[in-house]
């Protein structure tokens, strides 16, 4: 006798996050926001719940089916007897009509929201990155965005290397235009070059000598001659939000046989 299996109840996808910091949310909405907002996928429909401040921009820029007003849903929640509605109360009001009680959430979903949803009877299933598996396979446009960021990085690093070539060697240190060449000076140069190409760099590494042997030491102080100088540059495009990554080891002076 063939055994029949019960199908799982339908689940909705839920994010409560800021897309500026959450790549999965930005991927889903193509909307950049510095403050957390609610994003739901309910029975194939993609929804955002936005503050009045962001409503018009979201409706113009976001790649979703509908943008709902947070304040309007908040008023609806108050009429239902909720004195001070939280983000979870807003989610509950939106989900009420769909009768969905199961939620798929990202692994970094805030614990406070998860606890409040569970108190309301929702079942949550966290999903590891990448939340959207299709992110692994890049489209032609995504490849182009990554290439653009990488080219900008290569140009900035090449320009920094040109500075080191111009530097003079005095007392085992590098000098340029009458000043000692420091890690800070070269990092600033690289970061400014990247900004000129609409890329934002953080924690750029230009580390020389013993600092170059210390993983993720960003480097500080004078850069040495005749010793390794590590470059590790990984900016993000301010326009496309895609990253580049480039590492190089250079020496200004004589290379040790060791």
Model region roles, listed by residue range:
Residues 2-258:
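Active-site neighborhoods and metal-handling regions in enzymes and metal-associated proteins
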């Amino acid at each position: 006798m063939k055994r029949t299996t019960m199908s799982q109840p339908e689940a909705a996808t839920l994010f409560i996050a800021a897309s500026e910091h959450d790549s999965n949310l930005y991927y889903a909405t193509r909307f950049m926001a510095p403050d957390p907002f609610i994003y739901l996928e309910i029975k194939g429909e993609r929804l955002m719940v936005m503050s009045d401040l962001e409503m018009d921009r979201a409706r113009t820029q976001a790649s979703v089916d509908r943008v709902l007003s947070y304040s309007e849903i908040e008023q609806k929640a108050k009429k239902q007897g909720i004195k001070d509605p939280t983000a979870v109360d807003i989610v509950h009001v939106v989900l009420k009509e769909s009768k969905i009680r199961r939620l798929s959430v990202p692994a970094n979903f805030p614990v406070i929201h998860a606890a409040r949803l569970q108190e309301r009877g929702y079942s949550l299933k966290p999903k590891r990155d990448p939340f959207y598996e299709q992110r692994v396979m890049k489209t032609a446009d995504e490849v182009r965005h990554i290439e653009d960021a990488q080219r900008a990085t290569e140009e900035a690093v090449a320009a920094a290397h040109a500075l080191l070539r111009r530097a003079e060697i005095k007392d085992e240190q590098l000098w340029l235009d009458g000043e000692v060449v420091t890690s800070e000076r070269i990092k600033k140069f690289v970061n400014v070059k990247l900004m000129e190409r609409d890329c934002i760099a953080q924690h750029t590494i230009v580390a020389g000598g013993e600092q170059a042997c210390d993983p993720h030491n960003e480097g500080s102080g004078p850069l040495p001659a005749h010793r390794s100088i590590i470059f590790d540059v990984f900016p993000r495009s301010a326009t496309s939000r895609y990253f580049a990554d480039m590492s190089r080891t250079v020496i200004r002076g004589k290379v040790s046989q060791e």
